[in-house]
């Protein structure tokens, strides 16, 4: 036997073909959501309140401080929130202190700051009763970036950009004349020396002393016509505020507020970290030749002589001294923005590498490693980044790759929420300041100052309408899981589809182990929406980290010590692949080891390896890791396979795959669809609706019983996508369970494993051409045995509102409706649970008052005697739409009188749930896990299907031509291995990139006693004759996708027309017609079918009068009259006339043809006939 047995959960054993032992457990797969939100509640909120606090009025007399905050218990539970259509949230209360400095009076108060949406345990939010997910956003990290560019003459220049988290951008660039310019906040460019002068380095000599002598600097100084700090400040002010009278003081305060004010300019933690890393000397001196002797400032010890080349070893020696003040200079600018605040720079002189004689000396200036708490940019940062730019012109330093994951970071839920909350708070701050100055200072309370509306509004806006707050994809557990792990480059502050180029979308070497190279949508979003890799984590700065095993440099031993590294850190090391063979004691077995280093694949000796991959599946995402034999599939098809698994409809009887990857258990457990034990214990009672577990704990070696845990199961609930969400227990009373064990399966789960489809017997063969173009031929057995039957639940609601003419009424008493239509309604006029309904049946009877007419005396008398009955009402009942037939599952009634919260103007709301059992049909779409999708073209009786020598008919026939050109050979291996496993009565696991090899598959086939070529002789079910050739028959895992023919089938009789063109609308949702387009018209022209063509262009479309007459003629059995003028022709003429052209319609003998306008005599009756005939669907509500 090849492979070894592995246990997945309590109930499932699989034979695994994995050769690499797992050194690291998979992390919790939705940690990216939950951890980020926890950070927000713990620290994010606190940060926000400390940022904004204290708020003082314009005189500085009143001071408002935020001291502490707390979240209370949520008003409704998660289930109640869904049922009542409200947000699952908890009230946020903030302790506020108001201090009046004049009187010394202190007032403390707890202020309610609105309801704060809470995250559920499974990483989602419930907003207005619907489950939503906040998708993490991939953005450029705030930092300073350098890039090289070629101008139109082919000359190499450079550009630099300082990108903050919020605030003004600072850009540097060179031009053809070798002058260095700066742009402040996207304005026109000015010579960079103007900015240096404005900082307080007023004279040319000061600037040269600061940056070192350099021809680029000399060119720039020549171009710069401001000689002093004052002139420079005024020049900058005129650029930023054109048209305002410039003064030096205004210019100073403008620059200070633009760059050095923490409220207006924010680099965030990550920006300061990246900035210090880029501008720090230790990274910039590597490989450079010193032009001065380095001496320790404290001891006077010589650290490195002039002329020394700083390699890794020399650099490591002087590194501690660099931190301690080696090369520090104190810059004391005069008169500029930074006046009176001396700042430290760190400068070391090196010999320029682009000067062969070694004459030119460069200053390398660092920003003095500014403290992490300084979130705004400082003069030292500006000088160091300008210096880096000048160094780049002399080949010292590196340009940045913006698509490298070291330069892109994630904004997860917590940070997105924090940014939104900050906007709300800053709006509130403005209101507080205004109120402080208006209201009586002695009578003011904190409660009266604070207006929480802007805070609540900004949160509502974010959860309700942000691009990153999405309606959760709940088709199946895998779709839920993937949605929570999605990374989007779109959204506010990100890219747009149109602007994003090829480079941003492409796979980058730094994605390895961080972002999946396979799972991304097809279409305009390709590469902009990605999925987190299976082992990846996000660090405090928002960079994605991948885990690696450390290799001991002394002994060459691959240790079990796991380190998470960002893409930047990984660039410094040589990393070996996870599948490199190791000896028993953990050394590399081969002389040469395959490794990666900065995107290059190298073969190096074991002593040079620093780290090793943790697992072969760390490259791919959770969905991609569910594809067996992924290594044998073409990447384009694997992409489709990963995406289509998310569209699998939960089946009535799910069945976990015979050929799995071992990822099914983890995905199902972490998705949030299963019920997982929170504490160890013993199961006391199990019913379909709840599981009771008595907690047990170990005290001094003896077992002690504790509390009773209640786990409620969801039964037949509608998911966001209308599929059935149902949980069923998989444990029995008396079982001992551990913490983290699965207690109940969710939808698309089988014994704790993900089960998206069914294992069916598949043959690769053609059959009378019915599987042309990827079509699928299926046996009727799959219909009869409900193999691919799914349950769908649709929700319909009807509201009774107050109208101008009186309230609507939900009632059984509906005008012009027979008793037959009311037989399933109860006395309230609402359908009973369990009733079978068809299209057009009444679900909720409702009448709306019509316009009131003046009553005659007789009518008034009748009215007085019989009461309300004579009132004019019309029928606005809720009816079953087309294709919505099924069985009533549940009815919920909400009534304002019973204290239910309803939206304004609504008195009563009824929700009806209809459940459908959909069997598989011709026209339904199915797929395997390898991107092999197709539509069912024919369902054959079981007896007509080809059968195997033992008489078993096959279930599905696929076209063999679908395999070679698409290069997804994984399906063929799955087919053979599945057949062998089925014969052996086992389930197997073949993990991605470490699964069954070809020889393992053959060995298993042999073990199962199958034929050597794994093919089978098949017999034609119709004639009993054997087919000429042997056929590949096996077991494949096939899923039914959410594209079902019942949702797409549509036919129109008479329906709505567009208002202007009077042509039928399009699409199923509008009950529209089929478009007879340009090409179809050509076809009729080619056949000379003149009359058919004419009626398609006129009476079947937009000849308003003609279509009414045609209808009457058909009803009366007369011949259809001649067609008239299409409405669109009239529209065209009116448009030309509107342009001032005189357009007339002439007959063949040059007589002007009168076009009848809408108000002509024969139209009114036509229109009224039209209303009766054409628009039964459009009522007077509009």
Curated annotation (Swiss-Prot):
Q: Which UniProt keywords apply?
A: DNA-directed RNA polymerase, Nucleotidyltransferase, Transcription, Transferase
Annotated region described as Disordered, given as residue ranges: 1150-1182
Q: Which GO terms describe its cellular component?
A: DNA-directed RNA polymerase complex
Note the superkingdom of the native organism: Bacteria
Report biased composition (Acidic residues) as residue ranges.
1150-1162
What EC designation does it have? 2.7.7.6
Spell out the Pfam families in the cross-references: RNA_pol_Rpb2_1, RNA_pol_Rpb2_2, RNA_pol_Rpb2_3, RNA_pol_Rpb2_45, RNA_pol_Rpb2_6, RNA_pol_Rpb2_7
Under catalytic activity, the entry for this protein gives:
RNA(n) + a ribonucleoside 5'-triphosphate = RNA(n+1) + diphosphate
Could you give a single Gene Ontology term from the biological process aspect?
A: DNA-templated transcription
Look up keyword Transcription and say if it applies: yes
- EC class: transferase
Give the function comment from the record: DNA-dependent RNA polymerase catalyzes the transcription of DNA into RNA using the four ribonucleoside triphosphates as substrates.
Its family remark reads:
Belongs to the RNA polymerase beta chain family.
How does it associate, per the subunit comment?
A: The RNAP catalytic core consists of 2 alpha, 1 beta, 1 beta' and 1 omega subunit. When a sigma factor is associated with the core the holoenzyme is formed, which can initiate transcription.
> Which PANTHER family would you find in this protein's record?
DNA-DIRECTED RNA POLYMERASE I SUBUNIT 2 (PTHR20856)
* HAMAP family per the UniProt record, alphabetical: RNApol_bact_RpoB
Q: Report the protein name in the record.
A: DNA-directed RNA polymerase subunit beta
Write down the species: Exiguobacterium sp. (strain ATCC BAA-1283 / AT1b)
Q: Give the gene symbol.
A: rpoB
């Amino acid at each position: 036997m090849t492979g070894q047995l592995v246990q997945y959960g309590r109930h499932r054993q699989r034979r695994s073909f994995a050769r690499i032992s797992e050194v690291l457990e998979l992390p919790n797969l939705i940690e990216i959501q939950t951890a980020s939100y926890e950070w927000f509640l713990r620290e994010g909120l606190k940060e926000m309140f400390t940022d904004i606090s204290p708020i003082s009025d314009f005189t500085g007399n009143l001071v408002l401080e935020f001291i502490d905050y707390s979240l209370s218990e949520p008003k409704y539970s998660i289930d109640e929130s869904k049922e009542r259509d409200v947000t699952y949230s908890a009230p946020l209360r903030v302790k506020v202190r108001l201090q009046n400095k004049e009187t010394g009076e202190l007032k403390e108060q707890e202020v309610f700051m609105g309801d704060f949406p809470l995250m559920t345990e499974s990483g989602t939010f419930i907003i207005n009763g619907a489950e939503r997910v906040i998708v993490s956003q991939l953005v450029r990290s705030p930092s300073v970036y350098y890039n090289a560019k070629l101008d139109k003459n082919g000359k190499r220049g450079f550009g630099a950009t300082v990108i903050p988290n919020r605030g003004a951008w600072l850009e540097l660039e060179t031009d053809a004349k070798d002058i260095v310019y700066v742009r402040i906040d996207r304005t026109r460019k000015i010579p960079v020396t103007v900015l240096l002068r404005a900082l307080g380095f007023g004279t040319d000599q000061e600037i040269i002393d600061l940056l070192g002598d350099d021809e680029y600097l000399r060119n720039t100084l020549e171009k710069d016509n401001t000689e002093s700090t004052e002139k420079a400040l005024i020049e900058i002010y005129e650029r930023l505020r054109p048209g305002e009278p410039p003064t030096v003081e205004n210019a100073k305060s403008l620059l200070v507020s633009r760059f050095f004010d923490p409220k207006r300019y924010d680099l965030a933690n990550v920006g300061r970290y990246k900035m210090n890393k880029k501008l720090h000397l230790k990274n910039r001196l590597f490989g450079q030749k010193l032009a001065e002797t380095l001496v320790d400032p404290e001891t006077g010890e010589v650290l490195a002589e002039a002329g020394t080349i700083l390699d890794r070893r020399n650099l490591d020696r002087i590194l501690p001294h660099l931190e301690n003040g080696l090369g520090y200079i104190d810059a004391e600018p005069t008169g500029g923005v930074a006046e009176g605040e001396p700042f430290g720079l760190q400068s070391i002189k090196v010999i320029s590498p682009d000067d062969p004689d070694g004459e030119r000396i460069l200053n390398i200036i660092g920003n003095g490693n500014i403290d992490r708490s300084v979130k705004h940019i400082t003069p030292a940062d500006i000088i160091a980044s300008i210096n880096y730019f000048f160094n780049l012109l002399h080949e010292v330093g590196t340009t940045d790759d913006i698509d490298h994951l070291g330069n892109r970071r994630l904004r997860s839920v917590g940070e997105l929420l924090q940014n939104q909350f900050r906007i709300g708070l800053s709006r509130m701050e403005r209101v507080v300041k205004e109120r402080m100055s208006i209201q009586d200072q002695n009578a003011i309370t904190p409660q009266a100052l604070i207006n929480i509306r802007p805070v609540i509004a900004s949160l509502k806006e974010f959860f309700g309408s942000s691009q990153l707050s999405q309606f959760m994809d709940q088709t199946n557990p895998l779709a839920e899981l993937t949605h929570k792990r999605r990374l989007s480059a779109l959204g506010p502050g990100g890219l747009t589809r149109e602007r994003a180029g090829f480079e941003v979308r492409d796979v980058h070497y730094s994605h390895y182990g961080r972002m999946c190279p396979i799972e991304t949508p097809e279409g305009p979003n390709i590469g902009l929406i990605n999925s987190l890799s299976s082992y990846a984590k996000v660090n405090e700065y928002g960079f994605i980290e991948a885990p690696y095993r450390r290799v001991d440099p002394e002994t060459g031993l691959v240790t079990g010590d796991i380190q998470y590294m960002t893409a930047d850190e990984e660039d410094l090391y040589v990393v070996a692949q996870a599948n490199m063979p190791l000896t028993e004691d953990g050394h590399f077995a081969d002389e040469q080891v395959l490794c990666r280093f900065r995107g290059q694949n190298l073969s190096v000796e074991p002593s040079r390896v620093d780290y090793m991959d943790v697992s072969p599946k760390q490259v791919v995402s959770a969905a991609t890791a569910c594809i067996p034999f992924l290594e044998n599939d073409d990447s384009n098809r694997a992409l489709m396979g990963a995406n289509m698994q998310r569209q699998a409809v939960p089946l009535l009887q799910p069945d976990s795959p015979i050929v799995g990857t071992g990822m099914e258990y983890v995905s199902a457990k972490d998705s949030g669809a299963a019920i997982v034990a929170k504490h160890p214990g013993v199961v006391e009672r199990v019913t379909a609706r709840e599981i009771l577990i008595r907690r047990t704990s170990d005290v001094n070696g003896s077992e002690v019983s504790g509390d009773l845990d209640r786990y409620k199961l969801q039964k037949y609930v509608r998911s966001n996508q209308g599929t059935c969400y149902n949980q069923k227990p998989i444990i029995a009373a008396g079982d001992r369970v551990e913490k983290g064990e699965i207690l109940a399966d969710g939808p698309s789960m089988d014994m704790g494993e993900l089960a998206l489809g069914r294992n069916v017997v598949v043959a690769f063969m053609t059959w009378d051409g019915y599987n042309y173009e990827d079509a699928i031929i299926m046996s009727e057995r799959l219909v009869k045995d409900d193999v691919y039957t799914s349950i769908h639940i649709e929700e319909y609601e009807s509201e009774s509102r107050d109208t101008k003419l009186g309230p609507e009424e939900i009632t059984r008493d509906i005008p012009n409706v027979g008793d037959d239509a009311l037989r399933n309604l109860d006395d309230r006029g609402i359908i009973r649970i369990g009733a079978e309904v068809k299209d057009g049946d009444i679900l909720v009877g409702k009448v709306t008052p019509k316009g009131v007419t003046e009553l005659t005396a007789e009518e008034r008398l009748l009215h007085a005697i019989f009461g309300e009955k004579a009132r004019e009402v019309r029928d606005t009942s809720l009816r079953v739409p087309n294709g919505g037939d099924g069985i009533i599952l549940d009815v919920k009634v909400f009534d304002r009188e019973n204290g239910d919260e309803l939206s304004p103007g609504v008195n009563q709301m009824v929700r009806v749930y209809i459940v459908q059992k959909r069997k598989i049909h011709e026209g339904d779409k199915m797929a395997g896990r390898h991107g092999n999708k197709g539509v069912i073209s024919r369902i054959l009786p079981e007896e007509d299907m080809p059968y195997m020598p033992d008489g078993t008919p096959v279930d599905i026939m696929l076209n063999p031509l679908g395999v070679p050109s698409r290069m997804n050979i994984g399906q063929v291996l799955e087919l053979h291995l599945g057949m062998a496993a089925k014969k052996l009565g086992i389930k197997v696991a073949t993990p991605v990139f470490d699964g069954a090899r070809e020889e393992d598959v053959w060995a298993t086939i042999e073990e199962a006693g199958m034929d050597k070529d794994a093919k089978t002789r098949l017999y034609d079910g119709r004639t009993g004759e054997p087919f000429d050739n042997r056929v590949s028959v096996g077991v494949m895992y096939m899923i039914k996708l959410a594209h079902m023919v019942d949702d797409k089938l549509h036919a129109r009789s008479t329906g709505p027309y567009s208002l202007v063109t009077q042509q039928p609308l399009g699409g199923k949702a509008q009950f529209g017609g089929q478009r007879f387009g340009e090409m179809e018209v050509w076809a009729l022209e080619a056949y000379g079918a003149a009359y058919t063509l004419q009626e398609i262009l006129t009476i079947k479309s937009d000849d308003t009068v003609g279509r009414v007459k045609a209808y009457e003629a058909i009803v009366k059995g007369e011949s259809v009259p001649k067609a008239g003028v299409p409405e669109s022709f009239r529209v065209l003429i009116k448009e030309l006339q509107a342009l001032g052209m005189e357009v007339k319609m002439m007959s063949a003998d040059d007589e002007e043809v009168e076009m009848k306008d809408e108000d002509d005599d024969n139209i009114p009756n036509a229109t009224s006939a039209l209303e009766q005939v054409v628009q039964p669907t459009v009522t007077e509500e509009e």
